[in-house]
Amino acid sequence: MRGNPLIHLLAISFLCILSMVYSQLCPAPCACPWTPPQCPPGVPLVLDGCGCCRVCARRLGESCDHLHVCDPSQGLVCQPGAGPSGRGAVCLFEEDDGSCEVNGRRYLDGETFKPNCRVLCRCDDGGFTCLPLCSEDVRLPSWDCPRPRRIQVPGRCCPEWVCDQAVMQPAIQPSSAQGHQLSALVTPASADGPCPNWSTAWGPCSTTCGLGIATRVSNQNRFCQLEIQRRLCLSRPCLASRSHGSWNSAF
């Protein structure tokens, strides 16, 4: 079967162009230094893109080209257009599966895990979000326990409320000033009277990057009653591309 002569001519021309480009990028014969380069600890020696000389493999986030190849043992490939402002090539993971790494352990995208007994986390697109497992309830001062406080009980995960024995008061009728101060936290303030401020500190942001939600317990509302309040938070901007993030010091 005879082919089109024009197609044959184009194919031959294309092969000639490829051979010219290859000869410019990869000179023949190979010219390598007598001594191999000294690589940083943990960086292996690999053959360059021309298959001639041994070079230090490029690591995650480092620039790469036809000679300086990425570390194949780490699953890195040279991604064109991934450099600053979309220019140049950078070593990235071959398959960005959205997994995340916490305390040296890798979790799959969508997998839930407990870094400790106080929080439940979920791996989500290279980052992770966590929810508290310990109760955020608030114990108000009372006549028999005017100063409640949280303590860490041995053998228990979540802190518990106890009454400080050093300040325990006998079961007597409190003074009018003390009674007014304590009852103001329990009963709603009148429309004309001010609301005494009783608020906990804002909790951590629910996400490691991008917009998240932080919570606290406060009585700063129109009814002067304790409630869980929420607000938007931003820990840091998310990267444009997903990365295998590690947050070993988070817990």
UniProtKB/Swiss-Prot annotation:
Every IGFBP N-terminal domain range: 24-103
GO CC annotation terms, alphabetical: extracellular space; nucleus; plasma membrane
Signal peptide residue numbers: 1-23
Disulfide bond annotation, renumbered to this chain: C26-C50, C30-C52, C32-C53, C39-C56, C64-C78, C70-C100
Name of the featured protein: CCN family member 5
Protein species of origin: Mus musculus (Mouse)
Keyword terms of this UniProt record: Cell adhesion, Disulfide bond, Glycoprotein, Secreted, Signal
UniProt-annotated location(s): Secreted
Its job: May play an important role in modulating bone turnover. Promotes the adhesion of osteoblast cells and inhibits the binding of fibrinogen to integrin receptors. In addition, inhibits osteocalcin production.
Taxonomic superkingdom: Eukaryota
InterPro entries: CCN (IPR050941), Growth_fac_rcpt_cys_sf (IPR009030), IGFBP-like (IPR000867), Insulin_GF-bd_Cys-rich_CS (IPR017891), TSP1_CCN (IPR043973), TSP1_rpt (IPR000884), TSP1_rpt_sf (IPR036383), VWF_dom (IPR001007)
One Pfam family in the UniProt entry: TSP1_CCN
Family label: Belongs to the CCN family.
Annotated ranges, domain TSP type-1: 195-239
Stored PROSITE patterns: IGFBP_N_1, IGFBP_N_2, TSP1, VWFC_1, VWFC_2
Glycosylation, residue list: N197
GO MF: growth factor activity
Domain named VWFC: residues: 98-164
Primary subcellular site in the record, as a coarse category: secreted
PANTHER family for the chain: CCN FAMILY MEMBER 5 (PTHR11348:SF22), CONNECTIVE TISSUE GROWTH FACTOR-RELATED (PTHR11348)
One record GO biological process: cell adhesion
SMART domains: IB, VWC
